[in-house]
């Protein structure tokens, strides 16, 4: 693991490209407006009512796909499978492809784990009451660092994970980005279907996770891994799986 971090450090230092803009201002501006509009228009009706039973059942079926545990395990598996392939395969092309897979695993791991950690810290620091307690506290009740999950609604941790994961795939495979965005919205909104979060919690989580994926992609591009930087600073996925 020490060699892994040393390799990243060398790549970072060798890069002659300056750090591109992180676009956090634009992301924050759009997210704040979407969150405020959601709070004004949707959060109160959602908190005051219950989703119909079929909708809640659908949400319960789908919401588990946004759990970070299986995504983290999958990313670790990709990383070590790729590393093993790099050592065992013979041709230069096969080795390059195996290494590419391992870096995809590393990218997904960093994106999902660190965005999730930050989101969980934020939700504890903000301490917004969940929709289950709307009739007791309303939608603008906050108890920072209460240590109780009832006051850990904003932003949604599941939605952060979903936003990070599907944004990562949208950056890696931009041809399918519309499908990935649709999946992220659907899985994020399952948290509203099951009554665990307000829509504004989900919007904030999806946006934060997606921006964190962009940030991580920029850092990887700066190190020459998986991505390259376009003239405007946007990370573009490298392609190693072309046919011969």
Curated annotation (Swiss-Prot):
Lineage of origin: Bacteria, Pseudomonadati, Pseudomonadota, Alphaproteobacteria, Hyphomicrobiales
Give the EC number(s) under which this enzyme is classified. Answer: 3.1.-.-
What is the purpose of this protein? Removes the 1-phosphate group from (tetraacyl) lipid A species, has no requirement for the Kdo(2) moiety of lipid A. Has no 4'-phosphatase activity. Reduces sensitivity of S.meliloti strain 1021 to the cationic antimicrobial peptide (CAMP) polymyxin B.
Compartmental location: Cell inner membrane
Asked if the Swiss-Prot or TrEMBL record annotates the protein with the keyword Transport, the reply is no
Q: List the disulfide bonds.
A: none
Extra information? In this strain lipid A lacks phosphate groups, and both tetra- and pentaacylated species exist.
Predominant cellular place of this UniProt entry's protein: membrane
This protein's pathway reads:
Bacterial outer membrane biogenesis; LPS lipid A biosynthesis
MF terms from GO for this chain are: hydrolase activity
Keywords carried by this UniProt record: Cell inner membrane, Cell membrane, Hydrolase, Lipid A biosynthesis, Lipid biosynthesis, Lipid metabolism, Lipopolysaccharide biosynthesis, Membrane, Transmembrane, Transmembrane helix
What is its membrane topology?
Multi-pass membrane protein
Report the sequence similarity comment from the record. Belongs to the lipid A LpxE 1-phosphatase family.
Q: Which residues cross the membrane?
A: 28-48, 60-80, 98-118, 154-174, 178-198, 201-221
GO cellular component terms, semicolon-separated? plasma membrane
Q: What is this protein called?
A: Lipid A 1-phosphatase
- SUPFAM superfamilies, from UniProt? Acid phosphatase/Vanadium-dependent haloperoxidase
Provide the top EC class. Answer: hydrolase
- Pfam families according to UniProt: PAP2
Q: Which GO terms describe its biological process?
A: lipid A biosynthetic process; lipopolysaccharide biosynthetic process
The organism is Rhizobium johnstonii (strain DSM 114642 / LMG 32736 / 3841)
């Amino acid at each position: 693991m020490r060699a892994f971090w040393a390799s990243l450090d060398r790549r970072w230092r060798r890069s002659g490209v300056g750090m591109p803009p992180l676009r956090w201002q634009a992301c924050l501006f759009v997210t704040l407006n979407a969150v405020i509009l959601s709070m004004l228009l949707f959060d109160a009706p959602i908190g005051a009512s219950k989703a119909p039973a079929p909708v809640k059942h659908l949400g319960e079926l789908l919401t588990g796909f946004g759990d970070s545990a299986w995504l983290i395990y999958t990313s670790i598996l990709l990383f070590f499978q790729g590393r093993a392939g790099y050592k065992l395969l013979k041709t230069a092309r096969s080795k390059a492809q195996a290494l590419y897979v391992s870096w995809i695993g590393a990218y997904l791991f960093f994106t999902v784990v660190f965005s999730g950690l930050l989101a969980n810290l934020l939700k504890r620091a903000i301490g917004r009451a969940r929709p289950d307690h709307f009739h007791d506290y309303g939608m603008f009740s906050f108890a920072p660092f209460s240590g109780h999950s009832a006051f850990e609604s904003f932003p949604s941790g599941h939605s952060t994970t979903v936003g990070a994961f599907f944004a990562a795939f949208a950056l890696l495979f931009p041809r399918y980005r519309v499908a990935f965005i649709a999946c992220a919205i659907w899985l994020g909104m399952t948290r509203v279907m099951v009554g665990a979060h307000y829509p504004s919690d989900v919007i904030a989580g999806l946006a934060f996770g997606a921006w964190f994926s962009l940030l991580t992609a920029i850092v990887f591009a700066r190190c020459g891994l998986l991505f390259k930087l376009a003239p405007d600073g946007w990370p573009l996925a490298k392609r190693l799986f072309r046919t011969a």
